[in-house]
Amino acid sequence: MASVFKVRSASGHVPVVRTLAAMMAVTVVLTACHGGGDNHPPPQANVLPAFITASSVRTQFYDGNTDDLLTAGLGKTGLASATAPAIANAAQPTAAELRRLAIWSNYRALVDMTANGGYGRFWGPNVDLNGNDTLGEGKIAGKEYLAFADDGSGTQNVTVLVQIPASFNPDQPCIVTATSSGSRGVYGAISAAGEWGLKRGCAVAYTDKGSGNGAHELSSSLVTLIDGTLQNATAAGKASLFTANLGNTDLASYNSRFPNRYAFKHAHSQQNPEKDWGRNTLQAIQFAYWALNDSYGTLNGSTRNVRYTSGSITTIAASVSNGGGASLAAAEQDTSGLITAVVVGEPQINLRLPAQVSVAQGGVPVGAFGKPLADYMTLANMLQPCAALAPAAAGAPYLTALPGATTTSIRTARCASLAAAGVIAGADATTQATNALALLHQNGYQTDSDLLQAPMWDSQAVPAVAVTYADAYAKASVTANLCNFSFGTTNAAGTAGVTPAVSPMLTVFGNGNGVPPTNGINLVFNSGAGAADHRLATADGSYAGASCLRTLWTNGTLTGSVDAIRVNANLHGKPAIIVQGRADALVPINHASRPYLGLNQLSEGAASRLSFYEVTNAQHFDAFLGVAGFDSRFVPLHYYNLQALNLMWSHLKNGTPLPPSQVIHTVPRGGTPGAAPALTTANLPPIVASPGINAITAANGAVNVPN
């Protein structure tokens, strides 16, 4: 069957768009005749995995010049630009323009993009695998395969994407996964893991985990398709990335009471998508096998034979944050040898902890460990605005556009509300704030992250996660307005219900992160006085809503869904590396990597091949490192994620032993906040083969991390 060709632009770049009609023959089962005593099995046809929606599959080739796999044609320079890529017709962005915007925004969202912070010198499209500036603009030619994984209902529509670089060696095949971090779209981990895989010549298997940036504008019934373009929800049908499960009557009623609101896939799919993140990662790998066989299998008429069978390709499951947790879950669930090894950064993972697991630092038990996200995030969302006023948090980076006086007023009022509710004690704001910070310490937050409590809430990272995950775990409909929160557009004063001058839907695929506030869609609290930006809806920053979210955890409402996402830390002897910053204030290290190490050691014993590298002066968001106060105090975790990937590659290919678990004592850049000196290797000591007194130990489930 003839392939379909479409011209992308007047530049002369002509990517190939091959519809599934041209590939359907791969589902035909081949029969072969063998004679003369040939004992070889007959060739096997390359069959599209049953979970892939056949009509959704599409491929494109990028020439590595006008467009490419890593930078969407922007190159190192274009990615570094703070100016978003242009859209010719703002009222109707094309799929190619939205892809370019998504790659630009997602790349920048996970790494420090400043030259002094390391971009272009330690990482970036121009930096080769040895850390040298040899790759110019760093554009990478190759082919993309894009599809939905679904059960036939059209309600899952997990996006899977495979990038095969032109440098892929079919005789030495490799796959690197890049499961999206956060609730990002399918390109969410392109800088965190995809880039390294492409430079290594590996196919990269991406997935949005079924929680990626699908938005539904309820007032217009516009939804996004797999490529980010828009369509009416009814017309889109099963091709919609996400459509809220609402009847026409319910939708009309909700719109009349709460105009200009939005449903998001992670929050409102009512499927608890996190329970499937490991499976989604495995599906992405299976799709990569199919894509590689489609590209390199022997041509047999109109079909391709299977060249690569399950387990025959060196595959590293890699990503960060939620993508890191998904990678660990996938490795635990892998029963067919799809995953060879695991390398993850700052994994968000929820553990099924037995009593034998314990965590200590310097021989002293930590305040708490192994709590699930639903627990620690709802607590932090209540306490952080108040804790920000504690003397120990003075001088924290300021990460909000609100005036300083407004922020101080919110913090003071939050302290008063917490005290009135009996959550904290103290007769004045300073005492109350100190008590709030102490309560965070008691619940597993490191003193290393004291200066991050304020920016985690001010940036709205913590409120956004608290609301979205509560919705997801409660399997709440968008019409529930769980705890009186909703997602909507607001005016300059923060008032909700306003019709935006330009719909955020046009670019939500490119700019959105899947967790409002994002791309002009804000987190709204519907109070008795009216609906507004949650920070401004009440004097205390919508404390009633935050308290309600906390109660959903403490009263057991979320328990069933949280239990469904817990893992056992049994990696079945796969070599694995976890890297995390000690100062992480979004996913506290005491609730993630440290207890995972203990549980893994307990589960696997002597068979465990997990190494854990804890990095001092590193926190969760490398993209914040260009902000004043972050630059001078914190180092990039991404640097160590790259080192870990190189260490694992050497281990798999050369048998080089993985360095044991250890603390890496980094040196902050110092200097004036906002003008810190350039990052150098003096700030970034290496991961060492013999850590000595910096070794992290785990025995019988007990983890001890040296100070």
UniProtKB/Swiss-Prot annotation:
It is found in: Secreted. One of its GO terms (molecular function) is hydroxybutyrate-dimer hydrolase activity. Keywords: Hydrolase, Secreted, Signal. It comes from the Bacteria. It is an enzyme of class 3 (hydrolase). Residues 1-32 form the signal peptide. The active site is at residue 321. Participates in the degradation of poly-3-hydroxybutyrate (PHB). It works downstream of poly(3-hydroxybutyrate) depolymerase, hydrolyzing D(-)-3-hydroxybutyrate oligomers of various length (3HB-oligomers) into 3HB-monomers. This is D-(-)-3-hydroxybutyrate oligomer hydrolase. It comes from Paraburkholderia xenovorans (strain LB400). The lineage of its organism: Bacteria, Pseudomonadati, Pseudomonadota, Betaproteobacteria, Burkholderiales.
